[in-house]
């Protein structure tokens, strides 16, 4: 019997806290359906669970330093909740708790993160999230996070825009943290499809090549010249979709690669988050969000 898997299933189905799910399963002899009934009888969940609701808003937050850091996405349902003081504080607590237990979380993943105790508290992260979810009436979800630590002569850099909707985390060889953060800022803003040219799938490269249209007089040129022209076309397409080949947003006279090289930096890894990317979000105007919040509080 995989008890952790049963706890996870019960949490996903009920949105109840981890401790409540564990207790419910223990008294129900690890029967999920019986545990759901127990939770309902004890007022730990509402009959209509939030589990299937869409939480595509929220915040991206960072925590850590140049040696090890985390980029976190904590989701809620509306912008109204996302920019409330309590949600912002919760998001930062999540990030700080994860980075404070870096090795454990890196090795064991999200379930280990949710089971962590908060600093100076017996409450675990999953229950803190569930408690605030019950308080605000929205589905709150730790959607994803990425941890990076630095080795010898390496540095971790993070950037999150002030609106909390785009961010990036990077690992570079070299010690110019400010320059690396500038590249993280560029990555967040420009959102290239790929980081390195080597990341581009062969099928995409073939598509680029197929888009080449022969200019006038092309067939009259020597074969080597034709190959050079074709390669130049594909290289230009590659430069448009890769981070290192893009013009630096802060100085378009050079590429990101040239900027890094000038400052004796080498990019090893880079990951960008866009808040709610990949989630289909129901569009609601601000007035409707306020009205919804007011109705929940009455």
From Swiss-Prot:
Record protein name field: Elongation factor Ts
CDD domains xrefs: UBA_EF-Ts
Domain of life: Bacteria
Cytoplasm in keyword set: yes
Function: Associates with the EF-Tu.GDP complex and induces the exchange of GDP to GTP. It remains bound to the aminoacyl-tRNA.EF-Tu.GTP complex up to the GTP hydrolysis stage on the ribosome.
Gene3D superfamilies reported for this sequence: 1.10.286.20, DNA helicase RuvA subunit, C-terminal domain, Elongation factor Ts, dimerisation domain
Pfam families attached to this UniProt entry: EF_TS
Region of interest: Involved in Mg(2+) ion dislocation from EF-Tu: 78-81
Family: Belongs to the EF-Ts family.
Any one Gene Ontology cellular component term annotated for this protein: cytoplasm
Record GO terms (molecular function): translation elongation factor activity
Natural source organism: Mycoplasmopsis agalactiae (strain NCTC 10123 / CIP 59.7 / PG2)
Record keywords: Cytoplasm, Elongation factor, Protein biosynthesis
Location of the protein in the cell: Cytoplasm
Gene it is expressed from: tsf
InterPro entries membership: EF-Ts_dimer_sf, Transl_elong_EFTs/EF1B, Transl_elong_EFTs/EF1B_dimer, UBA-like_sf
């Amino acid at each position: 019997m995989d008890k952790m898997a049963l706890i996870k299933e019960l949490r996903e189905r009920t949105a109840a806290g981890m401790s409540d799910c564990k207790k419910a399963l223990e008294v129900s002899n690890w029967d999920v359906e019986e545990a759901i009934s127990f939770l309902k009888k004890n007022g730990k969940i509402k009959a209509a669970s939030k589990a299937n609701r869409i939480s595509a808003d929220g915040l991206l937050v960072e925590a850590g330093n140049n040696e090890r850091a985390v980029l976190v996405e904590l989701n809620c349902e509306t912008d109204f909740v996302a920019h409330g003081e309590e949600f912002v504080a919760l998001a930062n607590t999540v990030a700080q708790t994860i980075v404070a237990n870096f090795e454990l979380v890196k090795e064991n993943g999200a379930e280990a993160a949710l089971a962590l105790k908060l600093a100076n508290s017996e409450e675990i992260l999953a229950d803190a999230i569930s408690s605030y979810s019950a308080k605000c009436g929205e589905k709150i979800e730790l959607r994803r996070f990425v941890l990076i630590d630095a080795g010898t002569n390496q540095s971790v850099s993070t950037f999150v825009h002030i609106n909390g909707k785009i961010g990036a985390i990077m690992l570079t060889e070299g010690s110019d943290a400010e320059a690396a953060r500038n590249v993280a800022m560029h990555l967040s803003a420009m959102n290239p499809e790929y980081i390195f040219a080597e990341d581009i799938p062969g099928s995409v490269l073939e598509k680029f090549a197929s888009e080449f249209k022969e200019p006038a007089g092309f067939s009259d040129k020597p074969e080597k010249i034709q190959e050079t022209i074709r390669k130049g076309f594909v290289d230009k397409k590659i430069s448009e979709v890769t981070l290192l080949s893009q013009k630096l947003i802060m100085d378009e006279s050079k590429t990101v690669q040239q900027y890094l090289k000038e400052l004796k930096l080498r990019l090893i890894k880079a990951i960008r988050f866009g808040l709610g990317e990949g989630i289909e979000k129901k569009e609601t105007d601000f007035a409707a969000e306020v009205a919804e919040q007011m109705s929940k509080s009455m």
